[in-house]
């Protein structure tokens, strides 16, 4: 009996040991699940420029943007224009739809602030790579492109940028394009930084100017809470200092009243019940990359900056196949509560 009990004990011990050993082997074979960062930026825009964010699958993002006039651009003019509130530098209405979580298409209508007005825009955005939480892949990369056409009446002045002759040539003169490779890192839970190499092509430009221009954008977001953050943008042309009589770096060269100034934007974002609200100050009069990047003539140092706002809201077009946490968001909370 003693030997039987001893044998039984040894069998149970060896069986338990082999089971633990087998579980260890199985755990080694299972690869750890890769986790990606979420909400590097709150919405698909930082301020004027696009962020690496895309619209979620089967959701429609609707946004309205408004830029007022100069706060203090001319002596005493700020009194008569009530610090720019009586004026509208640009207005935009935009719809964007998420075909997948990584692919977004959009259309929009902008008033326009450059020589071409009444701008109709179509864009495509695809997120190629995502940043992982363990930083094994440290950045998110999104590709963006748009096509813009002006529907404004043709000028009678044949030397004007907005002179559109009849036929294909006139139609072509109305078009412009933007391409971007957006690269961002969510460095911490509260800080995100983005680089935006940008190429803008205009089919028709003022005499001596360049059709194609490169820009480099730097954007950042500092999150104070799940619903409040500070946002920043700066776009600088990658070009010779002087092209066709136009100075592209007037501040460095000590030139006043130049025909171009880099774009500097700063603002705050607030989220309330599913709406994301941006309040910002910019020296850009336009809202579209094709418009504000090549045509900005406003100088912060001369009071030529303006108050602006953007309000955006995403609507789920279908709750089918949506995870429960997404459904909870539409009832209450922040878009970042679920992460």
Regions found by a protein language model. Name each.
Residues 190, 195-241:
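A mid-sequence, solvent-exposed acidic-amphipathic segment
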Residues 13-15:
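N-terminal signal peptide c-region/cleavage motif recognized by signal peptidases
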Residues 1-5:
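Positively charged n-region of N-terminal signal peptides that target proteins for export
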Residues 331:
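Conserved N-terminal ligand/cofactor-binding loop architecture of enzyme catalytic domains
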Residues 19-156, 160-168, 175-179, 185-191, ...:
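Transmembrane beta-barrel domains of Gram-negative outer membranes and organellar outer membranes
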């Amino acid at each position: 009996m003693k030997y039987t009990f001893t044998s039984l004990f040894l069998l149970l011990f060896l069986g338990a040991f082999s089971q633990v050993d087998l579980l260890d082997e199985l755990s080694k074979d299972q690869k750890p699940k890769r986790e990606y960062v979420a909400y590097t930026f709150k919405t698909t825009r930082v301020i004027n420029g696009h962020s690496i964010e895309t619209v979620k699958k089967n959701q429609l993002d609707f946004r309205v943007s408004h830029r007022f006039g100069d706060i203090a651009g001319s002596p005493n003019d700020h009194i008569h224009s009530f610090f720019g509130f009586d004026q509208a530098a640009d207005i935009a209405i935009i719809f964007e739809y998420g075909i997948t979580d990584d692919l977004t298409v959009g259309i929009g209508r902008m008033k326009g602030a450059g020589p071409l007005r009444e701008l109709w825009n179509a864009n495509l955005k695809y997120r190629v790579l995502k940043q992982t939480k363990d930083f094994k892949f440290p950045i998110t990369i999104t590709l963006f492109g748009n096509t813009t056409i002006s529907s404004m009446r043709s000028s009678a002045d044949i030397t004007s940028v907005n002179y559109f002759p009849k036929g294909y040539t006139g139609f072509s003169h109305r078009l412009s394009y933007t391409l971007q490779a957006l690269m961002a890192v969510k460095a911490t839970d509260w800080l995100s930084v983005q680089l935006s190499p940008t190429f803008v092509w205009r089919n028709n430009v003022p005499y001596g100017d360049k059709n194609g221009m490169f820009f480099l954008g730097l954007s950042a977001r500092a999150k104070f809470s799940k619903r409040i953050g500070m946002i920043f943008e700066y776009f600088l042309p990658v070009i010779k200092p002087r092209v066709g009589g136009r100075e592209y770096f007037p501040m460095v060269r000590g030139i006043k009243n130049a025909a171009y100034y880099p774009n500097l934007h700063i603002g705050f974002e607030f989220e309330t019940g599913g709406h994301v609200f941006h309040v910002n100050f910019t020296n850009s009069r336009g809202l579209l990359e094709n418009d504000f990047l090549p045509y900005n003539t406003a100088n912060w140092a001369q009071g030529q900056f303006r108050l602006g706002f953007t309000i955006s809201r995403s609507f789920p077009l279908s709750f089918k196949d949506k995870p429960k946490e997404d459904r909870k968001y539409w009832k209450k909370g922040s878009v970042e509560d679920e992460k």
